[in-house]
Regions:
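Sec-dependent bacterial lipoprotein signal peptides
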Residues: 1-16
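Structured loop/turn residues at beta-strand edges in well-structured enzyme cores
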Residues: 11, 33, 94-97
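A structural "domain/chain start" motif
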Residues: 15-71, 168-172
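Second-shell loop/turn segments in exported
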Residues: 47-55, 112-113, 148-153
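Short beta-strand->alpha-helix linker/helix-N-cap micro-motif
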Residues: 65-89
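Short, highly charged low-complexity linear segments
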Residues: 67, 96-106, 158-171
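Surface-exposed short loop/turn segments
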Residues: 82-136, 146
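Short secondary-structure boundary motifs at beta->alpha junctions and helix caps
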Residues: 122, 128-172
């Protein structure tokens, strides 16, 4: 009896936690300075099949800004830039030491509470030196929601933890 109860309990507990993965695309070239400012672009909205998730690009940029603001002297989102070229033009007018380009690779919002199919995200994050435009770090962060949910979960809920963990490695 205890063996069966243990198996059931482990299945339930494992379904109660979101899972995350980080796939670094390059080694971090140098640690970032916390005395420097960061400029973040706003990625295009996530799309799954024929569904465009409105505001997912804006939400992603804000979550990236939040993660960097814990370490940088300032972190700013620019809503009308989606790539490095645009950020570099904006950089000329400001004093940003680092340029961050997020890109939504996968964004899937599911009704997990009744379907059992988890929400999923995958976001590529590239960090550039604002002066030289050389890439100093790049990763792909992914997340999958917990199986046991009572509703109200969304893909953006999967962003803070992996973003925070990766950004921390850029500074520490």
């Amino acid at each position: 009896r205890l063996g069966i109860a243990g198996v059931v309990l482990s299945i339930l507990v494992s379904g109660c936690a979101a899972t995350y993965a980080q796939r670094d695309l390059m080694d971090i070239v140098a640690k970032l300075s916390p005395k420097r400012a960061v400029l973040v672009s706003t990625p295009a909205n996530g799309i799954y099949g024929k569904i465009e998730y409105r505001s997912s690009g804006k939400i992603t940029a804000q979550e990236v800004r939040t993660a960097f603001s814990k370490f940088a002297s300032s972190a700013t989102v620019i809503s009308d830039c989606k790539d490095l070229q645009c950020l570099s033009r904006q950089q000329a007018a400001g004093s940003f030491s680092y340029l961050v380009v997020p890109q939504i690779l996968h964004w899937e919002d599911r009704a997990t509470e009744w379907s059992g199919i988890p929400d999923r995200i995958e976001v590529e994050l590239r960090v550039f030196d604002g002066e030289t435009l050389l890439e100093v770090g790049a990763t792909v962060l992914s997340g999958k929601s917990k199986w046991a949910t009572f509703g109200g979960d969304h893909p953006e809920d999967l962003l803070p933890e992996p973003l925070s963990n990766y950004v921390k490695t850029l500074y520490e």
